[in-house]
């Protein structure tokens, strides 16, 4: 039986000077015979959330996979602490190597996708978080009992 996962990530692949490790993890998971990736959610971290979505969507399309990608909201969990971190300053201006892909307006948010998918696969799903935990925190806000559905 394949292990069901959601990957929550801040992939900088496709951004000149960005870190590629999240994308390597995504590629390994998407091509593993032991893993079923139910979806990918993006969070602000190494790059702005919109850039992370574009990078993840581009990667999924290049690998010819039918995996949904959902974007989180820009910013951090605590809006009072939503200032740029020093190491992130200037990343918005980084040269984009891959094309920019914009999410559909009616697409579910990352936190809603996480909450719904975990409930629909109660006890059989694992969250693979390789970025800040903003989307997971917001999903727990949406459903405080969500942790009971995650393996």
Predicted regions and their residues:
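Active-site histidine-anchored catalytic micro-motif
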Residues: 1-39, 43-57, 92, 96-151
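Short, hinge-like loop/turn segments at secondary-structure boundaries
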Residues: 56-59, 86-88
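A glycine-rich helix N-cap at a beta->alpha junction
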Residues: 59-73
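Surface-exposed loop and adjacent secondary-structure segments within mature catalytic domains
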Residues: 70-98
């Amino acid at each position: 039986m394949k292990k069901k996962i959601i990957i929550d990530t801040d992939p900088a692949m496709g951004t000149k000077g960005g870190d590629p490790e999240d994308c390597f993890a995504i590629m390994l998971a998407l091509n593993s015979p032991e893993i079923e990736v139910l979806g990918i959610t993006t969070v602000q971290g190494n790059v702005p959330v919109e850039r992370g979505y574009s990078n993840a969507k581009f990667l999924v399309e290049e690998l010819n996979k039918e995996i949904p990608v959902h974007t989180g909201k820009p910013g951090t969990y605590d809006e009072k602490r939503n200032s740029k971190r020093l190491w992130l300053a200037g990343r918005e201006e980084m040269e984009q190597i891959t094309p920019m892909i914009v999410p559909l307006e009616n697409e579910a948010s990352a936190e809603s996708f996480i909450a719904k998918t975990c409930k629909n696969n109660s006890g059989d799903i694992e969250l693979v978080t390789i970025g800040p935990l903003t989307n997971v925190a917001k999903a727990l806000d949406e459903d405080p009992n969500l942790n009971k559905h995650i393996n």
